[in-house]
């Protein structure tokens, strides 16, 4: 039986997060205002062809699997691939943070979107903040750091959207927010996990220090319509 984290997008969007997904036959994707992630039911040509009929948007479809996804016959071609790592944590202690940590909600959505666009922590769209719980740090009313939850397969929750304004890096904001987020996931009886680009060695070292360990090598495949102009924005892992 396939482990849920071997196919995190399919596992999440066909179970706990099916309400924010769009499905066409054997293919599924996040609704475009939530994100760009998509998956086919399996690696068969029949399942992959269904990817052609999803809404591709200007950013294309982002698939995260153990192996690179072969483009289906038809409209889609590979625009970009990147090796990634998937990490999980079995124990994380929430820090006694020197910062005032706030829970972020709909009233903070515009500030969250602005910070994500500035820092590029990965794909972040109008309603990405609704995918799970987010927390943040404000300085004189300005949101300067945040972290939250994204994909939620059964028994697991992804830590994502971690970013800090350039003027406030080096103070430990991101590590505190990540530890708090991961500890709260564990307290719910779930396992926190995350993804990073494999060449982002600095980030991976930080994640290991926080209590995460390597679970699997993964591959990001970005599929776009043949002949599409421009490139999707690839954020930091």
Give the role of each language-model region.
Residues 123-165:
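A conserved beta-strand-loop-helix scaffold within acyl/acetyltransferase catalytic domains
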Residues 2-6, 90-122, 233-237:
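Short amphipathic alpha-helix that is part of the acyltransferase structural core
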Residues 2-96:
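Acyl-donor-binding surface of acyltransferase catalytic domains
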Residues 64-69, 193-204, 220-231:
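Conserved beta-strand-loop-alpha-helix junction that forms the acyl-donor binding cleft
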């Amino acid at each position: 039986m396939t482990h849920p984290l071997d196919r995190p997008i399919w596992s999440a969007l066909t179970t706990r997060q099916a309400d924010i997904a769009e499905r066409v036959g054997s293919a599924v994707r996040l609704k475009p205002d939530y994100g760009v992630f998509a998956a086919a039911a399996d690696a068969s040509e029949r399942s992959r062809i269904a990817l052609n009929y999803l809404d591709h948007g200007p950013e294309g479809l982002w698939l995260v699997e153990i192996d690179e996804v072969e483009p289906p016959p038809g409209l889609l071609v590979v625009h970009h691939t990147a090796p990634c790592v998937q990490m999980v944590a079995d124990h994380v202690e929430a820090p006694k943070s020197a910062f005032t940590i706030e829970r972020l909600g709909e009233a903070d959505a515009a500030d969250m979107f602005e910070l994500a666009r500035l820092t590029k922590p990965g794909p972040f769209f109008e309603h990405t903040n609704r995918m799970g719980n987010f927390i943040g740090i404000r300085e004189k009313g300005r949101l300067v750091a945040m972290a939250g939850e994204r994909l939620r397969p059964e028994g697991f929750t992804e830590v994502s959207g971690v970013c800090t304004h350039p003027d406030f890096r080096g103070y430990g904001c991101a590590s505190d927010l990540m530890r708090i987020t991961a500890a709260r996931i564990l307290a719910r009886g779930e396992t926190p996990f995350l993804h990073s680009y494999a060449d982002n060695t600095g980030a991976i070292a930080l994640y290991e220090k926080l209590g995460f360990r390597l679970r699997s090598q993964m591959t990001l495949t970005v599929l776009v319509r043949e002949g599409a102009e421009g490139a999707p924005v690839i954020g930091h892992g």
